[in-house]
Structures are given as structure tokens and as C-alpha cells.
């Protein structure tokens, strides 16, 4: 639910009000922000400003994302595509302005193979630099960029 907020990229402040990035960067230390909120026609997605340190297999990625902050997880395949699309609408610049990193790595989604009877060893990753979502072994090591549905 969007609550009549215009599509764009925002920073959630201490009381969880959404501040436009260009207003946020006027603060004394804009790098205190830990996340951005991507508002689209599909909803409001809160995204960590950088990948978690290290690499993870699929199960480790799910655990690490959940431990980042309450309510966080790896993105769905669809959210990963939304993040890629938003890179061309200012998402990477927003990350940089708050001391984060562009969303260009190869990262885990939250989605394993939907047919575990066929193959229980695979899951989906997204390639942030190109926007591809592909199938990969759950045992490979990839990045984690935690996300959450934004809640006020």
C-alpha cells in the first residue's frame, strides 16, 4: 500500500517518515541512513544501502538477510527486477549519496525452485549489472542485499 506517496526513492527518517533523497542529503551527516525506500506502482520496498559483507550460499543468505533487521529478507525475483529498473531512475545515485554502494552485484533472491520434486538444489539469483534473473545452485556463493516491505 502506497498511501498516496509519489513514485520515487526516499530515505526513511527516525519516525519512519519518507524524506526525498535531495532533502535528506542536506543533513549534517546523510550517511546515517541505512536504507532507501523504492516507491513504485507495485508498492514500497525498503532496501539496505549496501550488500552484507561476505558471500553466502542460498540458506546462509536467507538467514543473514533475516538477521540484518526485523522484517528483512532477500528480494523476490520480481523485486530484484524492480531494483534493476530503478537503477536508471536514481537508485544507485541515492545509495552513493548516503554512503552506500550501487546494486550491481550478483545476489540471491528469496526464491528456490518452485518444483522441488524436479530439483531441490537450485534457486534464483539476480545479476544487478544486467538485470538478469537466472537459476543457480543453492551451494554457490553470492551476495545478499536485504530488503523489506516498508512499514511506517
Language-model segments: what does each one mean?
Residues 1-72, 105, 109, 117-122, ...:
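Extracellular adhesion/carbohydrate-recognition regions
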Residues 58-73, 77-138, 147-152:
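An exposed tryptophan-centered "aromatic clamp" motif
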